[in-house]
């Protein structure tokens, strides 16, 4: 197993390049001759009110015994607004691809799918209490990934949640 990271941190910008992998693990469960994953995380402060972030990764898994390989990847872009000391908003766009069934996100037919998601989160602070409402829309490349209330298949879904955090 090999883990590695190269980074650069400046006052208004940071970037991290990460690697995790192993080779020669033919008797592991699940069986894999090699697994390689590389990721990039970066953030930049554009002003006192705005910042941007990126997080992306790709993973390749090779199985010599079964003579197959899998691959998946994902990317997320974050746009942050700090409106005041007590309130902020984050818009996150994510896309992940599982065309070679690497993370086992498949539709009802067993085919790998790609998903785009957009999330908007608020962050409201009062003393030690933080309220975080979030709304998310997901859209998949297959209409067989999500299930409607009536049991029918659909390619999109939405979620609303509220988190409450108290810090000691």
PLM-predicted stretches and their roles:
Residues 8, 13-23, 29-168:
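Outer-membrane beta-barrel pore domains
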Residues 2:
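Internal mixed-charge
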């Amino acid at each position: 197993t090999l883990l590695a990271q190269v980074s650069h941190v400046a006052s208004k910008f940071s970037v991290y390049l990460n690697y995790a992998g192993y080779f020669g693990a033919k008797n592991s469960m699940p069986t894999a001759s090699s697994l390689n994953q590389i990721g990039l995380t970066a953030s930049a402060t554009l002003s006192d009110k705005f910042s941007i972030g990126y997080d992306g990764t790709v993973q390749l898994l090779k199985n010599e015994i079964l003579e197959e390989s899998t691959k998946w990847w994902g990317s997320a872009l974050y746009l942050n607004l700090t409106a005041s000391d007590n309130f902020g908003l984050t818009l996150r766009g994510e896309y992940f691809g599982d065309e070679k069934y690497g993370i086992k996100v498949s539709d009802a037919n067993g085919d790998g799918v790609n998903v785009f998601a957009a999330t908007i989160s608020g962050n409201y602070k009062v003393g030690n209490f933080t309220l975080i409402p979030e709304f998310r829309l997901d859209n998949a490349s297959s209409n067989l990934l999500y299930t409607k209330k009536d049991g029918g298949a659909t390619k999109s879904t939405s979620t609303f949640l509220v988190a409450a955090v108290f810090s000691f």
